[in-house]
Amino acid sequence: VSGTMEHEDSLGNKGVIQSMGCQWMTAGSGILHKEMPQPSERMLGCQLWVNLPAAKKMVPPAYRDIAPDDIPVVMSDKATVRILSGSHRGIRGTLDNSYVQITYLDVTLPADASWKYNEARDDENLFLYLLEGSLFPEVKQQSAESKGCAILYSVPVPGEDTDEPVEVKAGPEGARFLLLSAPPLKEPIVWGGPIVMNSREELEEAFRELRNGTFIK
């Protein structure tokens, strides 16, 4: 979001993530990396972990960084929407992840402006994560009034009206938030430190490989 970060990893990749840029890393069968903040007036960023399906857990690792100018921007009502992944209003984002179909939008609203999003599929979970300002849903009895708050929208219950859009209004100082949506995998998750697997046995095996120096394939 703001500030500069240097990246280096076990694949030999080196890159600089600039303000308003992003990186996309697929851990897959294993990758070691380090992120090094550089002197900046302000450092603010988000790290989102996307769980891979069990059948894709051991795909080859990969990395790319994306310059700010390579991220599509559209005006949506009064909102400025940066499309990192998925699509919005017919415009596709820079990231095309074939393993998980995720929509990832960076939305900025001016003071007191409203915004409506009705492109989520019926089988998706969706959440909004507030970065700056305050945000008030027009329907759900929730609000995000401080940085780091989230508003969650889950898969509809069968038989319920699924046509209701996500509709929010910014507070008097405006709002900047992330919108993320994807179908739930409905698979077990076992997490330990930097590793996410589907069973305790898989997790323990990964840590054994780390200790034995065989983690990187």
Segments (PLM) and residue ranges:
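Jelly-roll (double-stranded beta-helix
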Residues: 1-217
